[in-house]
A protein has these predicted regions:
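A beta-strand signature from Gram-negative outer-membrane beta-barrel systems
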Residues: 10-55, 63, 78-91
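Hydrophobic, lipid-facing positions within transmembrane beta-strands of outer-membrane proteins
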Residues: 33-35, 77-81, 145-149, 193-199, ...
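Transmembrane beta-strands of outer-membrane beta-barrel pores
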Residues: 24, 54-60, 69, 100-104, ...
Length: 237
């Protein structure tokens, strides 16, 4: 199955704190009977501050795959930036974060060469006009983008309003259904974009009492078109 709702996936540098509750959650977290993880995002402060980071994994440093006996051509680069600070000192604060991952990788089809030859011979016999199947490596590139923008505003007193927008974009080819005993022509691509908007207003009624109103809207646009419209969908069991 696949997800049926937009899930906020955050960049590494936008996370301020993790809260892990194994049981006995408060009412604000709904009717969850088990444990849950609450992720708190960063906010701007009265000082402008930014970060840059980068990560690179090169295919020449990979170990050999146990099935193919050769190193899979995996190259991954991941980088991002964040910036936060005051729009109006002591009142309004901005925080923003961007992250991207570029992953050039390959999957492995382990169909025996004799089975590949038998399937292709059958396709030839019936006059199939599409491409033939193959074994070995197939391309599986992945691109991920994440963006977060957050504004906090403090009213006079201790009241506070927060609005946050987050988008997460995924692009991948031959993402689902290929590998092992399934040919690459049996796979589907993945084009997915999630949008999430969260707003909250905290009203301080007394030194011991607060009231919070919170709302969220999520939208997910998930597409999984076939990777190969003309190739045979071969899966051996």
């Amino acid at each position: 199955g696949v997800q049926t709702c937009a899930l906020p996936i955050l960049g590494l540098d936008s996370v301020r704190q993790f809260q892990v509750v194994t049981s006995g959650g408060q009412a604000e977290f709904g009717r969850a009977s088990g444990g849950f993880v609450n992720v708190l995002t960063k906010s701007g402060t009265n000082e402008w501050h930014g970060d840059l980071f980068g990560y690179l994994r090169n295919r020449h440093l990979n170990a050999a795959n146990a099935l193919s006996g050769t190193a899979l051509p995996l190259t991954q680069s991941q980088y991002g930036a964040s910036l936060g600070g005051p729009v109006v000192r002591d009142r309004t604060f901005l925080f923003t974060n961007f992250e991207q991952r570029i992953q050039n990788q390959a999957g492995l089809i382990a169909i025996a060469p004799s089975s590949v030859a038998a399937v292709n011979a059958r396709l030839d016999a019936v006059g199939y006009a599409g491409p033939r199947i193959s074994t070995g490596l197939y391309s599986n590139p992945v691109r991920l983008w994440s963006y977060l923008g957050k504004i906090d505003h403090r009213f006079r007193g201790d009241d506070q309003f927060t609005v946050r927008y987050n988008t997460y974009d995924t692009w991948s080819r031959n993402q689902r259904g290929a590998g092992g005993l399934s040919a690459a022509s049996a796979s589907s691509d993945l084009d997915n974009r999630d949008h999430t908007i969260v707003a909250s207003y905290i009203r301080t009624l007394s030194p011991r009492t607060q009231n919070e109103v919170r709302g969220q809207m999520g939208y997910s646009d998930l597409k999984a078109p076939p990777s190969d419209l003309t190739g045979p969908a071969v899966s051996i069991s």
